[in-house]
């Protein structure tokens, strides 16, 4: 059967070629009949005859095979070493038209969310991972059929112009009002008011009270709903519980007089803004003071390796700054703080904070860190004990600045005061070292000249 079909195709193609060249007498005007696939090579073939007809036009058709380069498979981007997998949340569906660099899906990892854009203009052919599915680096995500141009927004169809009404003679649809008649009678004279008649109370029927709704009919007062924990929240819970189970956490407290740092900020914030195009805040003072104290107490910058039972001392200072986002708490890292000045620190904090608010933090921005600062004072926290961010050994908690009466030189004065808390791993850091470290931070913030004099 296959050989017969091929024979018919070849014979018909040769006949059509002859028609087009004009060499065949059958193609001049009419066809008495064409016999296909009849010969000694095919004894069982049947005779196929095309009835007499006039050849008006011959049109050729061909099928175009889809080029493999037109359909591409987009894979999961490579993750950092500390991240193994993530959950997929689709922004597009099969059949959607996407432009180049348009976000197709978002992969939520333990630390951040990674957006996967479209590499070219095209149409999504298939989603290879279900919504909420787990993927690793290099896993195929979806297939895209590329198109030439970016998808254009559909223009609203213009409404057809309304046909102009035909001109017709104006006909009054409302008859003219009748002529007003002249009244022949005088209007009635109103009667004088009559005194009110009183009724006995027993004769008054009480008004029926509105029906009271049954308690069971009220809906929504005690409702509850459930939401699945996102991967970042699960990771935060796991790490905090891990720190609680592993570290011997202890917290020491102190208070800082913010008078000098507030005065310095008030005096130089305009010049600082003009020169560096940055606002001078309080966080840079605490970051710089922490780096100064970490150099004086390197054990606070160290960590215990539980696998090898060794203490790892770091010669660099990378400070993580906790930032609250709608998805959860993130801790971007300011690296090599010991080499930075106030302007460098403020610029880095501003850039990382902006990326955190836009959910654009990369995993590399939060990887590592040797010490953490958490500022609960921006939310009004007066006092608190922060939890260590593993694999670190200490965390500093800042709190709200409140005017309080304090004793200064034997007199009571109102000063802007802040409570600070240092939570540390008591397995590695002794109380003396922790208290000394916190007092170094206090001295550097209360009098920044300590940093200049290296006291």
UniProtKB/Swiss-Prot annotation:
One annotated GO biological process: L-lysine catabolic process to acetyl-CoA via saccharopine
Result, substituting residue 426 to C: 16% of activity
Transit peptide location on this chain: 1-68
Magnesium as UniProt keyword: no
EC number: 2.3.1.61
Modification N6-acetyllysine, positions: 155, 269, 274-275, 279, 309
MF-aspect GO terms: dihydrolipoyllysine-residue succinyltransferase activity
Phosphoserine sites (modified residues): 82
Active-site residues, Swiss-Prot/TrEMBL: 426, 430
Protein name, entry field: Dihydrolipoyllysine-residue succinyltransferase component of 2-oxoglutarate dehydrogenase complex, mitochondrial
Species of the source: Sus scrofa (Pig)
UniProt lineage: Eukaryota, Metazoa, Chordata, Craniata, Vertebrata
Gene this chain is encoded by: DLST
């Amino acid at each position: 059967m296959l050989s017969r079909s091929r024979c018919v195709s070849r014979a018909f193609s040769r006949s059509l070629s002859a028609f087009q060249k004009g060499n065949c007498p059958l193609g001049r005007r009419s066809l008495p009949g064409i016999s296909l696939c009849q010969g000694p090579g095919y004894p069982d073939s049947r005779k196929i005859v095309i009835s007499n007809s006039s050849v008006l036009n011959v049109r050729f058709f061909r099928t175009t095979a889809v080029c493999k380069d037109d359909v591409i498979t987009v894979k999961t981007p490579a993750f950092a070493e500390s991240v193994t997998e993530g959950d997929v949340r689709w922004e597009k569906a099969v059949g959607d038209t996407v432009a180049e660099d348009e976000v197709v899906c978002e992969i939520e990892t333990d630390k951040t969310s990674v957006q996967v854009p479209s590499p070219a203009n095209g149409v999504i052919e298939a989603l290879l991972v279900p919504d909420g599915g787990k993927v690793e680096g290099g896993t195929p995500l979806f297939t895209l059929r590329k198109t030439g141009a970016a998808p254009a927004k559909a223009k609203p169809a213009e409404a057809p112009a309304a046909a102009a009404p035909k001109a017709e003679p104006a006909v009054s649809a409302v008859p003219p009002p009748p002529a007003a008649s002249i009244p022949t009678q005088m209007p009635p004279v109103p009667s004088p008011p009559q005194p009110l008649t009183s009724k006995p109370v027993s004769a008054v029927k009480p008004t029926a009270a509105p029906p009271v709704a049954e308690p069971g009919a009220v809906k929504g007062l005690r409702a509850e709903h459930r939401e699945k924990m996102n991967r970042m929240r699960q990771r935060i819970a796991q790490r905090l519980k891990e720190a609680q189970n592993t570290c011997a956490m202890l917290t020491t407290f102190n208070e800082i007089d913010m008078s000098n740092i507030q005065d310095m900020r008030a005096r130089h914030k305009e010049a600082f803004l003009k020169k560096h195009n940055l606002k001078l805040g309080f966080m840079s003072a605490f970051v710089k003071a922490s780096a100064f104290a970490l150099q004086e107490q390197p054990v606070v910058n160290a960590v215990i390796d539980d696998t090898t039972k060794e203490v790892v001392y770091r010669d660099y200072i990378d400070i993580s700054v906790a930032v609250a986002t709608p998805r959860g708490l993130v801790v971007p890292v300011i690296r090599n703080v010991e080499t930075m000045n106030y302007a460098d620190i403020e610029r880095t904090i501003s850039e990382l904070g902006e990326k955190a608010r836009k959910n654009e933090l990369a995993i590399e921005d939060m990887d590592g860190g040797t010490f953490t600062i958490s500022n609960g004072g921006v939310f009004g926290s007066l006092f608190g004990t922060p939890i260590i961010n593993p694999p670190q050994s200490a965390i500093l908690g800042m709190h709200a600045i409140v005017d309080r009466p304090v004793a200064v030189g034997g007199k009571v004065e109102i000063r802007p005061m802040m409570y600070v808390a240092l939570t540390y791993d008591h397995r590695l850091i002794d109380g003396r070292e922790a208290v000394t470290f916190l007092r170094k931070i206090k001295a550097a913030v209360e009098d920044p000249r300590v940093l200049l004099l290296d006291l």
